[in-house]
Amino acid sequence: MKQLRLEPVVQVRGEINIPGSKSISNRALLLATLAKGTTTLTNLLDSDDIRHMLASLKQLGVEYRLSQNNTVCELIGLGGAISADTAQTLFLGNAGTAMRPLCAALTLGRGEFTLTGEPRMEERPIGDLVDALKQLGANIVYLKNEGFPPLAINATGLNGGDVEIAGDLSSQFLTALLMVAPLAKDSVNIHVKGELVSKPYIDITLALMAQFGVQVINHDYARFEIPAGQQYVSPGKVLVEGDASSASYFLAAGAIKGGEVKVTGVGRLSIQGDVKFADVLEKMGADIEWGDDYIIARGAPLTAVDLDMNHIPDAAMTIATAALFAKGTTTIRNIYNWRIKETDRLAAMATELRKVGALVEEGHDYIQITPPAVLNTAEIDTYNDHRMAMCFSMMAFANCGITINDPDCTSKTFPDYFAQFASLKV
């Protein structure tokens, strides 16, 4: 197993241009596929999740050209649903942002499709989405365990009408349903059951759908009306803004050991909810400065917070390791959906924080972290989870440093993360 040793860092300073957002990249690729016209996507994220989406689209007959560095994609839209004359099996790795939307999109046209992935994907729920699609007439069969991939789709198009979908587990289910609803045979009325988690991710979806010319009537996130007879039309160019979750590590670095760290590609004009991570750092005592497309974090003594972080679950993970450098006990609440991500992130985070000496209480949907007087070095297991690896890079700011096991798992969203992180050292 590969290991990466991070030696203690005294101070950080610098500027990082954040790679494209994973959430926006895969949504935009799918909408461009369903749209009429050719779309040029710039600042596309070059990572495993995006490669799985691109490989699947190519297999389904979608034509596109990628730049040499894979960050510009010119894609010729189908002007409607995806159909296939021969049965297709698509391997989607552990990419939830490809599995969920493609599962929905492939019900719109004609053909037989099988969706598979890595072993962890077979543990990540998809039942709430499948139940909703079945209400609209989709024919989907589970090939192993009820409610989980792999699954088979026999596509004949989607009817419209009323549909209920659970909102309390993952916003990706609602995102997938919203993106396909305009191409159903009749108008679609989506009723959301329970509290909607990760609401800002729905805002990303709605903003992109509007960019591609589709109207959605949002009744306070409890009900969505999507009128029939709409078509996605390419806006020509789509700029993928920087990944706000990825920005969180560099902003935390600035808050803990700045100096001054500036991230570009996200800012006050961002459509991603995870930029609110900077507000949490400010509550902890960091000096934060906002621009339209940048955020600056400057170091200051940090104090603990007790916050509901349901709407920024990915960036909230960074608070868990930043808490090691804050005075007092930090509590992160309402984060049950950490448990259904790339790994059970609540259990994994609690285990690894204890290794470095923190006192940790792990609840059903919360985590409480009290830092020790002196942090210990440790070998951090990353559970094939990119965010675990990046979060624990913060331990470089302890006097003992840290060893990261399997650091290459960051390839899911940020292949050169550790090189960029190293560039901040003074």
UniProtKB/Swiss-Prot annotation:
Active site: D314
Record's catalysed reaction(s): 3-phosphoshikimate + phosphoenolpyruvate = 5-O-(1-carboxyvinyl)-3-phosphoshikimate + phosphate
GO BP terms: amino acid biosynthetic process; aromatic amino acid family biosynthetic process; chorismate biosynthetic process
EC number in record: 2.5.1.19
Keyword Cell membrane among UniProt keywords: no
Record-listed phosphoenolpyruvate binding positions: K22, G96, R124, Q172, R345, R387, K412
GO molecular function, a single term: 3-phosphoshikimate 1-carboxyvinyltransferase activity
CDD domains on file: EPSP_synthase
Chief site of localization: cytoplasm
Compartments where found: Cytoplasm
Pfam families in alphabetical order: EPSP_synthase
Gene3D superfamilies in the record: Enolpyruvate transferase domain
Keywords: Amino-acid biosynthesis, Aromatic amino acid biosynthesis, Cytoplasm, Transferase
Domain of life: Bacteria
Binding site for 3-phosphoshikimate: K22, S23, R27, S170, S171, Q172, S198, D314, N337, K341
Pathway as given in its UniProt record: Metabolic intermediate biosynthesis; chorismate biosynthesis; chorismate from D-erythrose 4-phosphate and phosphoenolpyruvate: step 6/7
Subunit description: Monomer.
Family that this chain belongs to: Belongs to the EPSP synthase family.
Physiological role: Catalyzes the transfer of the enolpyruvyl moiety of phosphoenolpyruvate (PEP) to the 5-hydroxyl of shikimate-3-phosphate (S3P) to produce enolpyruvyl shikimate-3-phosphate and inorganic phosphate.
Protein name in the entry: 3-phosphoshikimate 1-carboxyvinyltransferase
Source organism (scientific name): Shewanella sp. (strain MR-4)
